[in-house]
Each structure stands twice: as C-alpha cells, then as structure tokens.
Amino acid sequence: MKAIKQKKQVLDNSMIEYEFFEDAMLIGIVCPLPSYQFVWRINKAFNYMFERTHEFEVEVKNEFYEVYCFAEEEKLIEHTIYVNRKNTHFLLDEIKHIDFIWMIKGGALPQEYTTQLLMYLNEVNAVVHSFVLNPQQLKSKHLLIL
C-alpha cells in the first residue's frame, strides 16, 4: 500500500495584517529612558492615562516586551505603546534603532493630528527623535497584533 503524503497547511495572515493596520498609525520613538519613566512623561505631557497591560505583553524568544494602553473613548481612538528594546533584544529586529513604538488606531486621523503629535512628542524631555513608521515595510509587524 502506498503511503499518502500529507500537505502542510499554512495560514495566510496577510489579510488579517492588512485589515489590522489599515486604520493604524505607527510612530517610532528614540528615547533612552526605561519604559515606566517614558510612559510617565507621555502621560504628563499629553494628559493621558497609559497603563501597563500585563495580559497583552508580547513574548519573543523568551523575552517579554511590555505594552501600555490608553483609549480615548469619546474619539474612538486606541493608543498602544510597545517597548521595542529589552536589554540587547528587540521586539522588531528590523528597527533596532527605535526604543518604543506608539500605535494609534481608530477614527479618521487628519494629517495635522500626526504633525502636532510628532511636534509635541519631540518636545518631551528625553525623547531624542520620533517619526512615522510605514507598517507595510515592517517584516515582523504581526507581533504588534494583540
């Protein structure tokens, strides 16, 4: 009797990724502070209430990367800050120069919102630089889907 070779089935997540990032804006932030100090400064500067969300921590290669969340419910906007650097490891290896990733999802975000956010963010003490990231250029963007 001839053995039947089974095919491996591979799940194509490209459509899920596309839909997830369709209404998202990503900001890369260079800041040498520990995550709790960085988030505290963001909360003070923007009058936000980011909180660490333990159930949404991202694990990659036995390293846990913190996630901080805040929702502007009246505007239907969700803010998420991911820690990208943990000691000498990175959540997204392709952007090793970035310490934090700030994702903003929901609502129609006008261009002036982005411009003002970057301007104010660059004024936060200890933030060296911040800029918009293109999620389509990130190979491991699936790690940002919670």
Language-model segment annotations:
Residues 2-46:
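N-terminal, charge-rich interaction modules
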Residues 30-74:
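Short, well-structured hydrophobic secondary-structure segments
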Residues 17-20, 54-55, 59, 93-95:
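Conserved functional micro-motifs across diverse proteins
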Residues 10-11, 17-19, 42, 67-72, ...:
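Noncatalytic linker/hinge segments flanking ATPase motor cores
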Residues 1, 51-53, 58-65, 78, ...:
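Acidic, serine/threonine-rich, charge-biased low-complexity segments
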Residues 23-26, 97-101, 141:
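Short, surface-exposed beta-edge/turn micro-motifs
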Residues 109-146:
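Glycine-rich, aromatic-bearing surface loops/beta-hairpins
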Residues 69-122:
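Amphipathic protein-protein interaction modules
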